[in-house]
């Protein structure tokens, strides 16, 4: 049986690398609408766009999606979702999935599976996903977030650094990253997709920001710092990359162009 869930898409215009990103045109529709369509395909009972920009809310509503105005001072997408959860008064056990607003190619099946993964792990406050890394360049890329897991695939830590560090494999080559071998042991890349229970979302803003969260700029570390558990669904295939730069946008825009005949 498919786990019922609500999908919320946090979207802000103030992107430093790609201004007005949520409204970027993808085949005649704004990016945030393309993401909302993916969430709807995943089977969400309700799809909401959460933003501090009226233009984003208008774009969502113009295409038939619900939209909620939020404050502009949220430090993370999870904080923005927490405001929505408090405003709409969802029951404690409602499963809420945070679908990143710059992921118009996100697999709807993965969205649905992460929601179900949370339901299957009642001791965990959050569920997310990861996939194996096979390229040494990704291991050492700080823009690729890694996650270390315990025996039950519950997160031990998330980092932009290469974790776990293979002393015998990496130390002889350090600091020549180009000479590093491909990992011969499991290294997992975190996929920025989260499922929460509404009860936890309402608690999240009351938790003080953690030093490790601020250092790594990874919002999920606040939950770990305060003793919460994060269940990680392992998927063998890497998801399509999100949109962070003008080059990323051009690549994805090409995919939404009608095929020429």
Swiss-Prot record:
Keywords: Cytoplasm, Lipopolysaccharide biosynthesis, Nucleotidyltransferase, Transferase. Its main location: cytoplasm. Coiled coil: none annotated. One of its GO terms (cellular component) is cytosol. Signal peptide: none annotated. Pathway: Nucleotide-sugar biosynthesis; CMP-3-deoxy-D-manno-octulosonate biosynthesis; CMP-3-deoxy-D-manno-octulosonate from 3-deoxy-D-manno-octulosonate and CTP: step 1/1; Bacterial outer membrane biogenesis; lipopolysaccharide biosynthesis. It is found in: Cytoplasm. Belongs to the KdsB family. Activates KDO (a required 8-carbon sugar) for incorporation into bacterial lipopolysaccharide in Gram-negative bacteria. This is 3-deoxy-manno-octulosonate cytidylyltransferase 1. It comes from Burkholderia lata (strain ATCC 17760 / DSM 23089 / LMG 22485 / NCIMB 9086 / R18194 / 383). The gene is kdsB1.
